From Swiss-Prot:
Its main location: membrane. It is found in: Cell membrane. InterPro entries: Bact_Sigma-Reg, PPM-type-like_dom_sf, PPM-type_phosphatase-like_dom, SpoII_E, SpoIIE_N. The keyword Hydrolase applies. Residues 355-565 form the PPM-type phosphatase domain. The lineage of its organism: Bacteria, Bacillati, Bacillota, Bacilli, Bacillales. It is a multi-pass membrane protein. This is Stage II sporulation protein E. GO terms for biological process: sporulation resulting in formation of a cellular spore. Keywords: Cell membrane, Hydrolase, Membrane, Protein phosphatase, Sporulation, Transmembrane, Transmembrane helix. Its EC number is 3.1.3.16. It comes from Priestia megaterium. The gene is spoIIE. GO terms for cellular component: plasma membrane. GO terms for molecular function: protein serine/threonine phosphatase activity.
């Protein structure tokens, strides 16, 4: 190509230079065919090309002249230092030096990016720790200390200039303190008027008892408001600390993923290269980062295939047979020119896939339901199923439940752990308004690699797993979100299998059947009697059965979500490569 372009440029200056173009093109072709001989092959290609072209040259251009010119070029080529040729090769697309230069540039950018992300991770971690240190996120003061602070503010306004101050607070401190503390508790409970004995004793003990009681009643309102504000500030700081810690972990994991280094797997690289080349595939370079089962990570540089999909249809199926893992193309960056190389990443596909079905109905057959549901496929190889039931019915309940699921989705997609996500949502719901906003949450996190499921049930009804004729109940005890500011999430773990059915429902379905004393036994029996394995049909049949027991009435919002776990079948079957099968082992 370089010879043709050079000869073409010469022909622009003089038409007679077309002869040189032919010579350079033919010599370049021979040099390319003899590229394994490196400098010797290139020299031999030029000399042979000159001899062959010279035999067909015009009379005014003899063979001797062409041969002298070619030998001169060979001598200059020999005198040219190797580092100059290498530097020139770096500028020519398609050469191994150019590709190596690009790889080094990419690695440099990768390392710089990873270091910056890691620095941000350390900053967020430091900020998180600063919120948990003394002075920012202290433990709550004890009740006795709070009472002491309150009574101190009361005495400043009542006893500070009283002539009996010395007698009450020096000689009879315990008696005075107990009287004022008891009055405070009675006022707080609204039962002071029902305790005349305490009022009489206070009148005998204090000359300003009426003023003391009035000040306590007045100050108690501000005291309660101040306590509530302190609790909200403390909870806000806790949320910030947890969120900063979560963000720090996500960024730290991201930095580790960027900075992943190649493992010392040269033998496996050569075996894979040989197997692919024996099949007729040309592979320029291969890098293995991991052959760990379930976490295979391989990168290759392959010639541009003009959109024929050779990586997906041939290389990935061969790797599947060689490694004993289901391998697919994770990312593909095609070459920008026909003779270039494509950068392809291969990795393990998910071992399982989830097929879902949903049945949904609003109270009274309306259009707005207080129930919301969501199915979220996360980047970490997990699949989330969630149902949220807002308090009551109608638009307000729909807003509560949909807001809960929207927050959950956004937090989970960042990679933050589900327990931290739920605690954060609970704190946000309890802090964002003075209104009572409660909502339940039924969350199932399915690991698509090993079929392990974590159930997080916040005030929700039981779920069921149907495995053949067996029905398994999943239940946990947690209050609805938004009631209390801080709580521990009870996580239930269950191992699912292929062809298992997971059935989740809101309370409108679970507690919906009329004239049924034991909802759990009734639901397990109905699920066990189902004759279909289609998730959508199961959701529809359960919904229909519950509505039939109520003579067609829908007295509450109703939602059923059904998920079926199945083995993941690759799009392309594996291509046998018996010589190196299971080399990863």
């Amino acid at each position: 190509t370089v010879g043709v372009v050079t000869g073409l440029i010469l022909s622009f200056a003089n038409v007679s230079s077309l002869y040189e173009m032919s010579l350079l093109a033919f010599s370049g072709l021979l040099g390319g065919l003899l590229k394994d001989g490196k400098k010797l092959g290139a020299r031999l290609g030029l000399v042979v090309g000159s001899l062959l072209i010279g035999l067909y040259a015009q009379a005014d251009q003899g063979l001797t002249t062409n041969l002298y010119e070619s030998l001169t070029a060979v001598v200059l080529f020999l005198l040219t230092p190797s580092f100059v040729l290498k530097n020139l090769s770096k500028l020519v697309p398609g050469t191994s030096e150019n590709m190596l230069e690009q790889q080094q540039y990419v690695r440099k950018i990768r390392d710089v990016t990873a270091n910056r992300v890691e620095q941000f991770s350390n900053v967020f971690q430091a900020l998180s720790k600063s919120f948990t240190q003394n002075g920012f996120y202290d433990e709550k003061p004890s009740a006795d200390k709070e009472v002491d602070y309150f009574l101190s503010s009361v005495t400043e306004r009542t006893c500070q200039f009283c002539f009996k101050k010395e007698q009450c607070w020096a000689q009879q401190f315990d008696t005075t303190y107990e009287y004022m503390k008891e009055i405070m508790l009675e006022v707080d409970n609204g039962t002071l008027e029902q305790n005349p004995r305490l009022i009489r004793e206070m009148d005998k003990h204090c000359v300003k008892s009426k003023k003391v009681i009035d000040v306590i009643e007045h100050e108690l309102t501000y005291f309660k408001a101040n306590q509530h504000l302190k609790a909200q500030i403390q909870e806000s700081r806790r949320i910030v600390a947890e969120q900063l810690h979560g963000v720090s972990e996500v960024m730290g994991n991201f930095a580790k993923e960027i900075k992943r280094e190649r493992e010392n797997l040269n033998v496996q690289e050569e075996q894979i290269l040989e197997a692919l080349r024996n099949f007729g595939m040309e592979i320029n370079q291969i890098e293995i980062y991991s052959l760990e089962p379930g976490n295979v990570d391989i990168e290759m540089w392959v010639p541009y295939c003009h959109g024929r999909g050779e990586c997906e249809k041939i290389i990935a199926p061969m790797l599947t047979d060689i490694l004993g893992e289901s391998i697919v193309v994770k990312n593909e960056e095609c070459a920008k020119y026909p003779q270039g190389y494509c950068h392809v990443s291969f990795g393990c596909t998910k071992a399982y896939v989830v097929d879902t079905g949903v049945a949904h109905a609003a109270k009274g057959g309306g259009f707005v339901s207080g129930d919301s549901y969501s199915m979220i496929e996360l980047n970490a190889g997990k699949y989330a199923l969630a149902i949220s039931d807002g308090m009551g019915n109608g638009e307000r309940a729909h807003y509560e439940s949909s807001e809960t699921l929207q927050l959950l989705k956004q937090i989970l997609q960042t990679g933050i752990e589900e327990t931290i996500a739920i605690k954060s949502i609970n704190s946000i719901l309890s802090l964002r308004t003075n209104d009572e906003i409660f909502s339940t949450l039924d969350l199932a996190m399915i690991d698509l690699q090993d079929a392990n499921v974590n159930f997080l049930k916040i005030g929700s009804t039981p779920s069921f797993i149907k495995r053949g004729d067996k029905v398994i109940k999943i239940q946990a005890s947690n209050l609805p979100m938004g009631i209390i500011e801080e709580f521990e999430v009870d996580v239930v773990n269950e191992q699912m299998k292929a062809e298992d059915l997971l059935i989740m429902m809101s309370d409108g379905v679970f507690e919906g059947p009329k004239h049924v004393e034991n909802y759990e036994m009734w639901m397990k029996r109905k699920i066990g009697e189902l004759q279909t394995n289609d998730p959508q049909e199961i959701a529809d049949l359960i919904m229909e059965e519950v509505i039939r027991t109520k003579v067609g009435l829908i007295e509450d919002d109703m939602t059923v979500v059904v998920a079926k776990l199945q083995h993941n079948t690759p799009k392309w079957s594996s291509i046998p490569s018996y010589a190196y099968r299971n080399l990863a082992q």
